[in-house]
């Protein structure tokens, strides 16, 4: 529809996973990775917090699937390849009409070390530094050569010598997952050592920001893994700002499509006018809110905004899915199936009788057996209705679409489950109105 192109990774017969893993995301060219990165407020906040003249560690806080690893990979590339990052910021500055983007200062003097800690490559954090810092081998020798005076963890003096030799940005993904899994007994007090060592790193990052930039990710702030860093008042990126919802929509569109930003507002408005007009009439939107509703539809295209909200705020929460990550998979599968055929994609396009429509991707995200069984019940209802009118001339217009929309809306939280006839009517309306 309107020449919209899915990214290559979503065009194969088998839909690939959408998870960004820090270790693999840092292996390719910076320009290629930044090409699939939308400059959300959280991305920009992270890059700014790691910039010159800043003096606080950075903590990315959020549950799985919210994009922490993607942001860390973007920061890694921004620190490692200033030219590519500056070009990326300049390009988006023009696209978004925000001159401040291209003025965002970037560090260009840091040795960047990144590690996905959940891969369990290292038992101790200092081993990462000793193994991968240019001055690490020398500093390991100092520490291990202290004999009876050797401390349980390397001292701040040893670390300061290392970072003075070569200023460093240390990017630690899945820090909480790693920390919580550490042994902590009298014989093997590894978690206590990690707790002490992260305190030393945090204090160096605060007191000597020209020597160390520390960036870690955690799932939540109520863990010991976070407490020592919290003491030095870090910059917290938590995906909850006032722009978060709008940014998430833009991120979804940019991650899914190569050219969504190039489709004009006039083209979209013309394409979806019939559907939006009927939606406004059926839902009885007040006149004062109608322009706002039309803007919402235009911004969310090719998806209906109420469908995105339904998936994001109700279904994925109710089914304990991994938020943005699973939403990308679901929408990619859905667009591949119906995107070229309908002016706007609604809940009615989650066809219960067609596995290509994104149903499988959605069910893969469902943790609750009750939700998984709802599709079986919906299919039985579909067959029952068809059987009831078999052998008669009674038409059943839009039957599959109506039951599909009702099924999807029934996956929502109990207090929000189901739909009235006007909502279902709006869901099945395409480029022409349907008689009430």
Regions found by a protein language model. Give the residues of each.
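Phosphate-handling catalytic cores of nucleic-acid transaction enzymes
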Residues: 2, 14-21, 48, 54, ...
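Conserved P-loop NTPase catalytic core
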Residues: 100-123, 200-342
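Mid-core helix/loop region of P-loop NTP-binding domains shared across ATPases and GTPases
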Residues: 138-176, 182-183, 192-204, 208
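Extended, well-ordered alpha-helical scaffold/bundle regions in very large, multi-domain proteins
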Residues: 210-226, 230, 415-436
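C-terminal helical "lid" subdomain and adjoining coupling/linker elements of P-loop NTPases
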Residues: 182-185, 278-399, 412-423, 427-435
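Conserved P-loop NTPase mechanochemical-coupling segment
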Residues: 27, 109-151, 174-188
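Walker A/P-loop-proximal flanking segment of P-loop NTPase domains
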Residues: 1-66, 73, 79, 233-263
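Flexible phosphate/Mg2+-sensing switch loops adjacent to catalytic phosphate-binding sites
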Residues: 76-111, 139-153, 432-436
């Amino acid at each position: 529809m309107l020449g919209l192109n899915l990214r290559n990774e979503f065009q194969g017969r088998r839909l690939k996973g959408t998870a960004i893993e820090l270790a693999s995301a840092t292996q390719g060219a910076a320009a290629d990775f930044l090409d699939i990165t939308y400059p959300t407020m959280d991305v920009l906040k992270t890059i700014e917090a790691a910039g010159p003249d800043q003096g606080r560690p950075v903590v990315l806080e959020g549950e799985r699937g919210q994009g922490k690893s993607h942001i860390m990979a973007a920061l890694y590339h921004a620190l490692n390849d200033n030219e590519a990052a500056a070009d990326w910021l300049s390009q988006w500055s023009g696209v978004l009409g925000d001159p401040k983007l291209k003025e965002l200062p970037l560090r260009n003097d840091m040795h960047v070390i990144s590690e996905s800690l959940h891969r369990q490559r290292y038992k101790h954090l200092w081993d990462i530094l000793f193994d991968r810092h240019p001055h690490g081998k020398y500093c390991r020798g100092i520490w291990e050569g202290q004999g009876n005076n050797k401390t349980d963890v390397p001292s701040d003096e040893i670390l300061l010598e290392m970072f003075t030799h070569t200023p460093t940005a240390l990017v630690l993904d899945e820090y909480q997952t790693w920390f919580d899994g550490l042994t902590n007994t009298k014989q093997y007090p590894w978690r206590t050592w990690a707790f002490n060592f992260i305190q030393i790193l945090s204090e160096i990052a605060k007191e000597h920001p020209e020597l160390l930039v520390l960036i870690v990710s955690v799932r939540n702030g109520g863990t010991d893994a976070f407490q020592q860093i919290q003491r030095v008042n870090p910059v917290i990126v938590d995906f909850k700002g006032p722009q978060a919802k709008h940014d998430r929509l833009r991120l979804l569109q940019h991650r899914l499509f190569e050219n969504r930003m190039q489709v004009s507002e006039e083209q979209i408005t013309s394409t979806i006018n019939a559907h939006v007009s009927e939606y406004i009439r059926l839902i009885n939107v007040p006149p004062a809110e109608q322009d706002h509703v039309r803007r919402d539809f235009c911004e969310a295209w090719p998806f209906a905004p109420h469908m995105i909200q339904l998936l994001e705020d109700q279904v994925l929460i109710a089914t304990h899915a991994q938020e943005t990550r699973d939403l990308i998979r679901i929408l990619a599968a859905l667009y591949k199936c119906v995107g070229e055929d309908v002016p706007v994609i609604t809940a009615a396009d989650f066809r219960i009788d067609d596995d290509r429509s994104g149903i499988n991707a959605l069910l893969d995200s469902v943790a609750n057996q009750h939700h998984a069984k709802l599709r079986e019940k919906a299919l039985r209802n579909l067959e029952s209705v068809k059987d009831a009118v078999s052998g008669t001339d009674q038409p059943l217009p839009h039957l599959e679409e109506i039951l599909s929309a009702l099924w999807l809306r029934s996956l929502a939280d109990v207090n929000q489950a189901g739909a009235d006839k006007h909502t279902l009517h709006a869901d099945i309306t395409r480029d022409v109105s349907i008689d009430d």
